């Protein structure tokens, strides 16, 4: 099984890759920013011997096609990616609205378009309870449109990000 992950260097992503690598037939391709390349060796050490089944792909989810070349797209295309898992996001409540929109909204649009371009199998999004805004009480999956008080940029961008995936995937 082949996986493509955004956010693999983050808290959840590092642990998810570890779990996926416990599956003997798994290969994990992960998007990494160029400035994060020094982190690759640390990740490989964390993942141990199974790290030889991981493949860093330098790119940027804020760019169309994730900033990948035609050659990279061709290499990943054709159903070789069974699961695309989108974890990457700005989760800093103090980050500017502009950067949150760029990463959380436009980044998600770009990842969805990328998944379509490479003919990925299943698309998985790790969202946030913030997508509910300040809704009081129990908020179920089927209540997405009932989110309230999305004025805070993080809440709004996570809500819009999840909406993109709900509509397009």
Segments (PLM) and residue ranges:
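N-terminal Rossmann NAD(P)H-binding glycine-rich loop of SDR-like oxidoreductase domains
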Residues: 1-25
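Short, well-ordered alpha-helices that flank and scaffold nucleotide-derived cofactor binding pockets
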Residues: 18-22, 113-116, 167
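Glycine-rich phosphate-binding loop and adjoining beta1-alpha1-beta2 segment
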Residues: 27-67
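NAD(P)H-binding glycine-rich loop region in Rossmannoid oxidoreductase-like domains
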Residues: 50, 54, 58-106, 118
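Conserved Rossmann-fold NAD(P)-dependent oxidoreductase catalytic core, especially the SDR/UDP-sugar
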Residues: 86, 94, 98-99, 106-156
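Active-site Tyr-X1-5-Lys
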Residues: 149-169
């Amino acid at each position: 099984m082949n996986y493509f992950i955004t956010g693999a260097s983050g808290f959840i992503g590092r642990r998810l890759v570890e779990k996926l690598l416990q599956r003997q037939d798994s290969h994990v391709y992960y998007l990494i920013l160029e400035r994060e390349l020094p982190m690759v060796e640390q990740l490989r050490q964390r993942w141990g011997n199974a790290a030889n089944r991981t493949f860093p792909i330098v790119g940027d989810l804020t760019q169309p096609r994730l900033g990948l070349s035609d050659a990279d797209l061709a290499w990943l295309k054709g159903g070789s990616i069974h699961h695309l898992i989108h974890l990457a996001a700005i989760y800093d409540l103090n980050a500017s609205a502009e950067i949150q929109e760029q990463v959380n909204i436009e980044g998600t649009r770009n990842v969805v378009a990328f998944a379509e371009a490479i003919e990925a199998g299943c698309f998985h999004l790790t969202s946030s309870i913030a997508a509910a805004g300040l809704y009081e009480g129990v908020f179920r999956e089927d209540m997405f449109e009932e989110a309230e008080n999305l004025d805070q940029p993080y809440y709004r961008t996570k809500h819009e990000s999840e909406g993109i995936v709900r509509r397009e995937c």
